[in-house]
Amino acid sequence: MPKMKTKSSAKKRFRVRPGGTVKRGQAFKRHILTKMTTRNKRHLRGTVAVHETNMGSMAQMLPGAGL
């Protein structure tokens, strides 16, 4: 059986942490930000963990990550 390929789109967007969680960037931070308050933009900074309900999808997209 050949190896499963990693999804290139997931490779670019997610990083697996040593504890097995996956971190991702926040959405809604690309354009049309003038109507968004400074507080909203500040809360969208940085990275957050992928929710546990989506970890099954992560395991399929990143088969070599050991999730």
Swiss-Prot record:
UniProt keyword annotations, A-Z: Ribonucleoprotein, Ribosomal protein
Q: Give the source's domain of life in one word.
A: Bacteria
Residue stretches of biased makeup (Basic residues) = 1-16
Q: Quick one: a GO biological-process term for this protein?
A: translation
Q: From the Swiss-Prot or TrEMBL record, what is one GO molecular function term?
A: structural constituent of ribosome
The record's InterPro entries line, in alphabetical order, gives: Ribosomal_bL35, Ribosomal_bL35-like, Ribosomal_bL35_CS, Ribosomal_bL35_sf
Q: Which residues form the signal peptide?
A: none
Please give the GO cellular component terms listed in this UniProt entry.
Answer: cytosolic large ribosomal subunit
> Where are the residues of the annotated region Disordered?
1-24
Q: Does the keyword Flavoprotein apply?
A: no
Q: Which family does it belong to?
A: Belongs to the bacterial ribosomal protein bL35 family.
Name of the gene encoding the protein in the UniProt record: rpmI
Q: What is this protein called?
A: Large ribosomal subunit protein bL35
